Amino acid sequence: MSGHNKWANIKHRKMAQDAKKSKIFTKLIREIIVAAREGGGNIETNPRLRAAVEKARAENMPKENIERAIKRGTGELEGVDYQEVIYEGYAPGGVAVYIRALTDNKNRTAQELRHLFNKYGGSLAESGSVSWIFERKGVIEIPRDKVKDLEELMMIAIDAGAEDIKDTEDPIQIITTPENLSEVKSKLEEAGYEVEAKVTFIPKNTMKVTGKDAEKVLEFLNALEDMDDVQEVYSNFEMDDKEMEEILSRLEG
């Protein structure tokens, strides 16, 4: 069985491979602008900015684009005033959806989201309706074929402060507190591992969906991700691996 994490990884790979690459850049630039505005333009003293810049570099964003976005955030260059807004709701089948948006027009974003929720048979809910279902965690991912000694990896991660290790799927996931993410990541990189790290929201419980509901959920989540104002979408669905792959293949076809 797989859930939101597998969907997010598949979606990200497809976006990186096709014409939607520019949409990734748009979202990353907004994140850099807001991170620099809130915590300053120095990546050494601003963890959120450092994480955003690392993501941008991983996507091969040109250096000048990154620097320009930082200057827009610090006010050295004129830029759009983005606000961070959280939206919560339910997808088909009762799946909880937690959305983080960066927008210059909250009314427009709320209207577009309400339209999508209604279109796909979900419902936009009040603040606090589903946030309690999710925990904010640091997640480090390492491709299974890059790990020669799983026991060694686990020891390094645990000694550095990791909370949990999920080694049943690919990539292997190491769970940390948001505060310990940077330390665990650094220790793994010092040991020679190539990792991807992020702060995310992990559901405490999941909702299994199948058939039409499963298709509607994935179609709905894809539509949310395609919105320029939406930075991240989190959900607590769970479905069969094969069914997810078949549905995504049809949707992307």
From Swiss-Prot:
GO terms for molecular function: DNA binding. Coiled coil: none annotated. It is found in: Cytoplasm. InterPro entries: Integrase-like_N, TACO1_YebC-like_2nd/3rd_dom, TACO1_YebC_N, Transcrip_reg_TACO1-like, Transcrip_reg_TACO1-like_dom3, YebC-like. Gene3D superfamilies: 1.10.10.200, 3.30.70.980. It holds the Pfam family Transcrip_reg. GO terms for cellular component: cytosol. Keywords: Cytoplasm, DNA-binding, Transcription, Transcription regulation. One of its GO terms (biological process) is regulation of DNA-templated transcription. Belongs to the TACO1 family. PANTHER family: TRANSCRIPTIONAL REGULATORY PROTEIN YEBC-RELATED, TRANSLATIONAL ACTIVATOR OF CYTOCHROME C OXIDASE 1. This is Probable transcriptional regulatory protein Tpet_0454. It comes from Thermotoga petrophila (strain ATCC BAA-488 / DSM 13995 / JCM 10881 / RKU-1).
